[in-house]
C-alpha cells in the first residue's frame, strides 16, 4: 500500500502542476498497486479464517495502511476532479 500511496500523492502533485496526463498515469499505477495489495489482504484474511495465520501487530498495521490508502485514493480522485473542473472553468 505504501507504493500506491506515493503514486496517489504524485498524481495529486502532477494535477496541481497542470500535468493531467501524467496525473492520470500515476492514478493508474496506484490502482494497480492497490489491487495487488488487496489481493494479498484477501489471501491473509482467508488464512486467518482457516486458523493458519497468527495475529501480529505488523499485520494489523498493514491492514490499517491499506484501508487508509484506499480512503485517500477516493479523496485524491475527487480532488483531482475539482482541479480539472476549476481548470476547465477558469476558476469560476
Question: What name fits each language-model region?
Answer:
Residues 2-92:
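Terminal alpha-helical segments
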Amino acid at each position: 500500500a505504501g507504493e500506491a500511496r506515493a503514486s496517489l500523492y504524485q498524481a495529486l502533485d502532477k494535477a496541481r502542476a497542470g500535468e493531467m496526463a501524467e496525473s492520470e498515469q500515476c492514478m493508474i499505477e496506484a490502482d494497480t498497486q492497490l489491487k495487488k495489495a488487496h489481493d494479498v489482504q484477501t489471501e491473509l484474511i482467508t488464512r486467518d479464517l482457516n486458523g493458519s495465520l497468527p495475529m501480529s501487530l505488523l499485520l494489523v498495521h498493514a491492514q490499517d495502511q491499506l484501508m487508509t490508502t484506499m480512503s485517500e485514493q477516493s479523496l485524491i480522485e475527487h480532488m483531482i476532479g475539482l482541479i480539472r473542473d476549476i481548470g476547465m472553468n477558469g476558476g469560476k
